[in-house]
Amino acid sequence: MTVLVVDTSAVVALLKSEPGWETLATRLHAASSRVLSVANWVELSLVAAGRHGDEATLEFLDRFLQTAAIEFNSVDEPQARIAREAFLRFGKGRHPAGLNFGDCFSYALARTLDAPLLFVGNDFIQTDVRVAMEVREQARS
């Protein structure tokens, strides 16, 4: 069973059809199980509501996640501790990776499940998390 942890950045890129979205979609589809931290679901909701500000946008987001078979994973105390440690090691203002709050929860979920992380950008490659796509694959798309 191939579990894939999905970061907020990957969902945003898919929803906005950003460059490389096709490769992200292929990776997402290839996984037998896709998971998103509930902390990242809230982050996605805040981003969507901040840009569009209506309930229909949030309903669209939830339908997309359901259609993509992305399951929510609750944050427990051990995972929260890993997220806190991720900030101390890789957080904004502390490390070139510059992980933000949501990034720390994606990192923690990937580490907890020992699963690759699907994301967009150069932040997570500067950490010790397993990555689902190399940056050059993102750039080629």
Each language-model region and where it sits:
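General small-molecule cofactor/ligand-binding pocket signal
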Residues: 35, 71-73, 132
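Short, well-structured N-terminal submotif of metal-dependent ribonuclease cores
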Residues: 1-36, 49-63
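Acidic, PIN/NYN-like endoribonuclease modules and their adjacent C-terminal/linker elements
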Residues: 3, 107-141
